[in-house]
Amino acid sequence: MTFLSKLVQAGTMFSMLALSASATSATLETSVFNPQEKSLFPVSSVLITGPTEAILVDAQFQRNDAQSVVELIRKSGKKLTTIYISHGDPDYYFGLDVITAAYPHAKVVSSAKTQEYIIASMVPKKSYWGPILKENAPQELVVPEVLKGDTLMVDGEKVKIVGLDGHDPKHTFVWIPSSKTMLGGVVVFGNMHVFLADTQTPESRHLWYKTLDVIEQLHPTTVIPGHIVGNKPLTIQAVNFTRQYIQNFETAAKASSNSSELIAKMQASYPNIGGDNILVLSAKVIMGEMKWGQ
């Protein structure tokens, strides 16, 4: 059986991978919408489909991108049963009002930690980002229900949420056991500067390393980064890239006296990756030049 993983850029779907699996493998497929650098955050929304059903992981940041996700779901021809929000940052859930308007019967769920984070921060986040997003800001905010257990189902196949009871329940990831596919969410980046403004302490970054170790121990065949720029293969290399980037950033920060020096060092180390705006923000926060809670 062939397992297809597709990346959708600016509403156009193209095949990234065609991986051969055994006859006992699942019928589940993944399709990924990522607006790339046409939007503020190149965040991945992943549609997991079986023969008749589908679940969506993450709902985009901007209304126009959420509408592209709606079109992706419609083109699949599957029944959307569930929308899972993997993290509480607004680029994962601001698009929910668009998607739930199109699919009002789909259940919206998240982990308890994610729901708690969204409830505590969604109003100030909308106040901060609304003037920036303008017409692409959410018209209303949707709060997920808490997922019972750690398993979602698609046509009888399991999709697992890994890390709910682990070392860092706020940062989990999605795992499709039958196809050994991992959806990285907030913890895996690909070919772009890693967002570090939310992990301002060595302890928080140590937990991040541990999560990357857990992913590696699963030996995934396919890794879909939560944020990615370009057409890099969807492999374990994204996990390696993320870990090495964080290590290099920490080393560069210790050797820098201000954010400008840190930015210059990281751009010299990574001259051909995306997300310069993310680097600037991360550097200012880590060097203590900017407070970050948005």
Task: Cite the ranges covered by each PLM segment.
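Bacterial N-terminal signal peptides that target proteins for export
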Residues: M1-G11
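Accessory terminal helices/loops
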Residues: Q217-T222, V229-Q294
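Divalent metal-coordination and catalytic microenvironments
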Residues: I48, D58, I73, H87, ...
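Metallo-beta-lactamase
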Residues: F61, I119-N240, N248
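N-terminal signal peptide c-region/cleavage motif recognized by signal peptidases
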Residues: A18-S22
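Conserved beta-strand hairpin/beta-sheet module of binuclear metal-dependent hydrolase folds
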Residues: A26-K75, F173-G185
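Active-site metal-binding motif and surrounding structural segment of the metallo-beta-lactamase
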Residues: N64-S110
